[in-house]
Amino acid sequence: MAVKVIIPTPLRAYAGRQASVELQAATVAEALSALTAKFGDLKKHLYSDDGRLRSFVNVYVNDEDIRYLQKDQTRLNEGDTVSIVPSIAGGARY
């Protein structure tokens, strides 16, 4: 089924500068796999060397955090939106 994947601004440089893409996927894992197949440079920013989603990368399906659903096996429905949200750390030291 067709789903929309939102690509965050910091990662758009690795995705042809696209803000979003439409992909065919039945689960979050399939959507992310299709995304990294389409944009190979994204893979190292989303996954660690052991193939796991990086801990600072949060994924949402229709604003629901997949960590509280079925993680990457969360089922997708036609028209769902998958959002990738990398955590940002840093700041000034006082």
Report residues per predicted region.
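Ubiquitin-like/PB1-type beta-grasp interaction modules and other compact soluble beta-rich domains
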Residues: 1-94
